[in-house]
Amino acid sequence: MTNIRKTHPLMKIVNNAFVDLPAPSNISSWWNFGSLLGICLVLQILTGLFLAMHYTSDTTTAFSSVTHICRDVNYGWIIRYMHANGASMFFICLFMHVGRGLYYGSYIFLETWNIGVILLFATMATAFMGYVLPWGQMSFWGATVITNLLSAIPYIGTDLVEWIWGGFSVDKATLTRFFAFHFILPFIIAALAMVHLLFLHETGSNNPTGIPSDADKIPFHPYYTIKDILGAMLLILILMLLVLFSPDLLGDPDNYTPANPLNTPPHIKPEWYFLFAYAILRSIPNKLGGVLALVLSILILVLVPFLHMSKQRSMMFRPISQCMFWILVADLLTLTWIGGQPVEHPYIIIGQLASIMYFLIILVLMPVASTIENNLLKW
């Protein structure tokens, strides 16, 4: 009798994705982040669901409902901080996952890559709206500043902003709709992640060498299931260290002050995972130019497959491109640092130079490095 795992209409889908999936024998720990992102998403949906049971999306009670969760709800504090720090872990995994894709040329799988970029946008939108919900000072002013950017769009800008706000300022209507969207988006992300996986399984995984591995495949289970469990344990360990020892390490103290439209915080800044994009936005003196640069800083990922000039897929055997990649990583870290600094003399010019470098590396220097390496192969 054939195994039910291989015959049952539902079970065989799971089987072909997680058990009998042929996987390259040499994929490294950089390939763990896909499953870690899945774990992060499930964790965020579960903790978010329990938070939503006690949260109220009304401007008068939102802040105190979060306080109530932390003080009065059984284990509410741990659920709240797992959700807040879970978002940080989510973005760490996302950045690692995208970085892996860039380094090893995984972007050659066009459909998988483009759905991944959409997933990144959706996750960023979800995180932004989630940050507004506690209705602290940084929630309110972050929402005001970021939504206001849309007013830079010619002709329809102002109407668009007021339509999103549901009034003439960020108020009750804005908070309610942000809560609604924040609740629904993770399920859309989950659906997109399944499509992402569907397209990946059409081609099979890439591997560190970038060379097709059809001749050398091993079953996903037990080899990579056990490897993923190790990754998951490390992820949960780091998350729980954050939650239990320094839950507010990555947060902003201003968000412990209830939202006050009459009092602007001295330094408005988003959560750490948006700082690189925020630095790019701020480094351009023109409003519309800044907004375009902000969107392009992420949207540029769509162009990466078309800028691939190398005869090799992976950067494993391309030292010049490797150098460019790590300069890009250093540049992103610089932008993240600048995004959290006040807008004054040394930081402005550093931010502008780092922003120029970011686009220059991706659009010019990486393709040039690839072309040089192609010519070096002829020697």
Curated annotation (Swiss-Prot):
<dbReference type="InterPro" id="IPR036150">
    <property type="entry name" value="Cyt_b/b6_C_sf"/>
</dbReference>
<dbReference type="GO" id="GO:0006122">
    <property type="term" value="P:mitochondrial electron transport, ubiquinol to cytochrome c"/>
</dbReference>
<dbReference type="GO" id="GO:0008121">
    <property type="term" value="F:ubiquinol-cytochrome-c reductase activity"/>
</dbReference>
<feature type="transmembrane region" description="Helical">
    <location>
        <begin position="77"/>
        <end position="98"/>
    </location>
</feature>
<keyword id="KW-0679">Respiratory chain</keyword>
<feature type="binding site" description="axial binding residue">
    <location>
        <position position="83"/>
    </location>
    <ligand>
        <name>heme b b562</name>
    </ligand>
</feature>
<keyword id="KW-0249">Electron transport</keyword>
<feature type="binding site">
    <location>
        <position position="201"/>
    </location>
    <ligand>
        <name>a ubiquinone</name>
    </ligand>
</feature>
<keyword id="KW-0479">Metal-binding</keyword>
<keyword id="KW-0812">Transmembrane</keyword>
<keyword id="KW-0472">Membrane</keyword>
<feature type="transmembrane region" description="Helical">
    <location>
        <begin position="320"/>
        <end position="340"/>
    </location>
</feature>
<dbReference type="GO" id="GO:0046872">
    <property type="term" value="F:metal ion binding"/>
</dbReference>
<keyword id="KW-1133">Transmembrane helix</keyword>
<dbReference type="Pfam" id="PF00033">
    <property type="entry name" value="Cytochrome_B"/>
</dbReference>
<keyword id="KW-0999">Mitochondrion inner membrane</keyword>
<comment type="subunit">
    <text>The cytochrome bc1 complex contains 11 subunits: 3 respiratory subunits (MT-CYB, CYC1 and UQCRFS1), 2 core proteins (UQCRC1 and UQCRC2) and 6 low-molecular weight proteins (UQCRH/QCR6, UQCRB/QCR7, UQCRQ/QCR8, UQCR10/QCR9, UQCR11/QCR10 and a cleavage product of UQCRFS1). This cytochrome bc1 complex then forms a dimer.</text>
</comment>
<comment type="similarity">
    <text>Belongs to the cytochrome b family.</text>
</comment>
<feature type="transmembrane region" description="Helical">
    <location>
        <begin position="178"/>
        <end position="198"/>
    </location>
</feature>
<feature type="transmembrane region" description="Helical">
    <location>
        <begin position="226"/>
        <end position="246"/>
    </location>
</feature>
<dbReference type="InterPro" id="IPR027387">
    <property type="entry name" value="Cytb/b6-like_sf"/>
</dbReference>
<feature type="transmembrane region" description="Helical">
    <location>
        <begin position="113"/>
        <end position="133"/>
    </location>
</feature>
<protein>
    <recommendedName>
        <fullName>Cytochrome b</fullName>
    </recommendedName>
</protein>
<feature type="transmembrane region" description="Helical">
    <location>
        <begin position="288"/>
        <end position="308"/>
    </location>
</feature>
<dbReference type="InterPro" id="IPR048260">
    <property type="entry name" value="Cytochrome_b_C_euk/bac"/>
</dbReference>
<keyword id="KW-0813">Transport</keyword>
<comment type="function">
    <text>Component of the ubiquinol-cytochrome c reductase complex (complex III or cytochrome b-c1 complex) that is part of the mitochondrial respiratory chain. The b-c1 complex mediates electron transfer from ubiquinol to cytochrome c. Contributes to the generation of a proton gradient across the mitochondrial membrane that is then used for ATP synthesis.</text>
</comment>
<dbReference type="InterPro" id="IPR005797">
    <property type="entry name" value="Cyt_b/b6_N"/>
</dbReference>
<dbReference type="Pfam" id="PF00032">
    <property type="entry name" value="Cytochrom_B_C"/>
</dbReference>
<dbReference type="GO" id="GO:0045275">
    <property type="term" value="C:respiratory chain complex III"/>
</dbReference>
<feature type="binding site" description="axial binding residue">
    <location>
        <position position="196"/>
    </location>
    <ligand>
        <name>heme b b566</name>
    </ligand>
</feature>
<feature type="binding site" description="axial binding residue">
    <location>
        <position position="97"/>
    </location>
    <ligand>
        <name>heme b b566</name>
    </ligand>
</feature>
<keyword id="KW-0830">Ubiquinone</keyword>
<feature type="transmembrane region" description="Helical">
    <location>
        <begin position="347"/>
        <end position="367"/>
    </location>
</feature>
<keyword id="KW-0496">Mitochondrion</keyword>
<feature type="transmembrane region" description="Helical">
    <location>
        <begin position="33"/>
        <end position="53"/>
    </location>
</feature>
<feature type="binding site" description="axial binding residue">
    <location>
        <position position="182"/>
    </location>
    <ligand>
        <name>heme b b562</name>
    </ligand>
</feature>
<dbReference type="GO" id="GO:0005743">
    <property type="term" value="C:mitochondrial inner membrane"/>
</dbReference>
<dbReference type="InterPro" id="IPR016174">
    <property type="entry name" value="Di-haem_cyt_TM"/>
</dbReference>
<dbReference type="InterPro" id="IPR005798">
    <property type="entry name" value="Cyt_b/b6_C"/>
</dbReference>
<dbReference type="InterPro" id="IPR048259">
    <property type="entry name" value="Cytochrome_b_N_euk/bac"/>
</dbReference>
<keyword id="KW-0408">Iron</keyword>
